[in-house]
């Protein structure tokens, strides 16, 4: 198959979620990407094009196919068999939204192949049904910062663009599976603790809306919902908090369920922080990312190229 045979491509940014106390509701797009190149074929087949996705299921047991099939079936449609080439630099099970990017891409795949004509709101709802919450999926679909609530019959979301920050990520080479990260959380919080946790979350959102990054950074490190319980799973967290804070970061938090740790810093200062953290954490990948304003992009083959 050559580029001339391609029907369309779908490019989706990765994401981070929570930012500390914005648990299961706050998400932000990040400049790591998943790209699907879709070709007509006589059967469903998925081909990995990068090491990150090497070993993914190659047939109809692939997550992308399963989500696309369920999305199309909701409208009584079937999907024509396709060859899907999968390129990605979003590491799996690291808290950078790899599954949400795949789910968002799958919803768009169904939308294109079955001509569903889904609205943005419908895409968000179907992706959130698969994910269980809208933070990562919303960020991948729409870019920028998103704050949302997902319920079985409806998904609400507010989004904001122009997030003028550098985001430095420290990515350990071990995985933290979402199930394991959920298992360490308490079944409940006491009423006073829940009130305090909610207040911290409210202040995080207020800071985000005002783009008061110093306030945001302080609230990121005051979370009471999940980070106190997950520290044992990510021993680097406390050390990165200290090192990043000593080098100008506004604040540091787990990215999603971890193990990736992210730090916010003033635009233009991220590379210096990246270099500093890379020297301190040689056993991790360290990168300086940005927050793209654009979410999912579909590029269709031009009629003129036929």
From Swiss-Prot:
It comes from the Bacteria. It is found in: Cytoplasm. It is an enzyme of class 2 (transferase). GO terms for biological process: threonine biosynthetic process. Pathway: Amino-acid biosynthesis; L-threonine biosynthesis; L-threonine from L-aspartate: step 4/5. It catalyses: L-homoserine + ATP = O-phospho-L-homoserine + ADP + H(+). The keyword Transferase applies. Its EC number is 2.7.1.39. Keywords: Amino-acid biosynthesis, ATP-binding, Cytoplasm, Kinase, Nucleotide-binding, Threonine biosynthesis, Transferase. Its main location: cytoplasm. Coiled coil: none annotated. InterPro entries: GHMP_kinase_C_dom, GHMP_kinase_C_sf, GHMP_kinase_N_dom, GHMP_knse_ATP-bd_CS, Homoserine_kinase, Ribosomal_Su5_D2-typ_SF, Ribsml_uS5_D2-typ_fold_subgr. It holds the Pfam family GHMP_kinases_N. One of its GO terms (molecular function) is ATP binding. ATP binds at residues 91-101. One of its GO terms (cellular component) is cytoplasm. HAMAP family: Homoser_kinase. Belongs to the GHMP kinase family. Homoserine kinase subfamily. Catalyzes the ATP-dependent phosphorylation of L-homoserine to L-homoserine phosphate. This is Homoserine kinase. It comes from Bacillus licheniformis (strain ATCC 14580 / DSM 13 / JCM 2505 / CCUG 7422 / NBRC 12200 / NCIMB 9375 / NCTC 10341 / NRRL NRS-1264 / Gibson 46). The gene is thrB.
